[in-house]
Each structure stands twice: as structure tokens, then as C-alpha cells.
Curated annotation (Swiss-Prot):
The keyword Secreted does not apply. Keywords: DNA damage, DNA repair, Nucleus, Transcription, Transcription regulation. Belongs to the TFB5 family. Component of the 7-subunit TFIIH core complex composed of XPB/SSL2, XPD/RAD3, SSL1, TFB1, TFB2, TFB4 and TFB5, which is active in NER. The core complex associates with the 3-subunit CTD-kinase module TFIIK composed of CCL1, KIN28 and TFB3 to form the 10-subunit holoenzyme (holo-TFIIH) active in transcription. GO terms for cellular component: cytosol; transcription factor TFIIH core complex; transcription factor TFIIH holo complex. The gene is TFB5. Component of the general transcription and DNA repair factor IIH (TFIIH) core complex, which is involved in general and transcription-coupled nucleotide excision repair (NER) of damaged DNA and, when complexed to TFIIK, in RNA transcription by RNA polymerase II. In NER, TFIIH acts by opening DNA around the lesion to allow the excision of the damaged oligonucleotide and its replacement by a new DNA fragment. In transcription, TFIIH has an essential role in transcription initiation. It comes from Yarrowia lipolytica (strain CLIB 122 / E 150) (Yeast). The lineage of its organism: Eukaryota, Fungi, Dikarya, Ascomycota, Saccharomycotina. Its main location: nucleus. The keyword Protein biosynthesis does not apply. GO terms for biological process: nucleotide-excision repair, preincision complex assembly; transcription by RNA polymerase II; transcription initiation at RNA polymerase II promoter. This is General transcription and DNA repair factor IIH subunit TFB5.
Amino acid sequence: MPKATRGVLIECDPSIKALIVNIDSSQHNIILDELDDTHLMIHPSMVEVVKQKLNKMLAENTYNPNEEAAKATGK
């Protein structure tokens, strides 16, 4: 008999999907199913957690020239 699972469909770029898979690799309770290269089904209660962790990861990997200028001047 088929089993139904409630989830949230996420459509994203393959690079963002890789980040979400990386987040899930440490917890194993986020991704319910990997549908294809750009779609994931994730647990409904984990949507906000994924958003927060993605924002943090993307902020860490974003170049900000103002921060570089502040470091150079010692501020």
C-alpha cells in the first residue's frame, strides 16, 4: 500500500540543493526525498531551519568590499 508523507516542495539551483544536502548530512531529518537536480521534498517543520542555515552559509561565502576596506584600515 502506498505511503503518503507530508512535505514542502523546494525548487532551487543545483548549487543551493547541494548546500541543503550538506546541511541534511549532519542531521538526517530535513530531506524527505531528492526528486531531481532542482527539487527537494523537505520536512515541513524544518523549512525555517533550512532558511536560517542557508542564509548563514551564503553570508559567510559572500564577498563584501566594505569589510575588506575596514580590515585594511584597521577599523
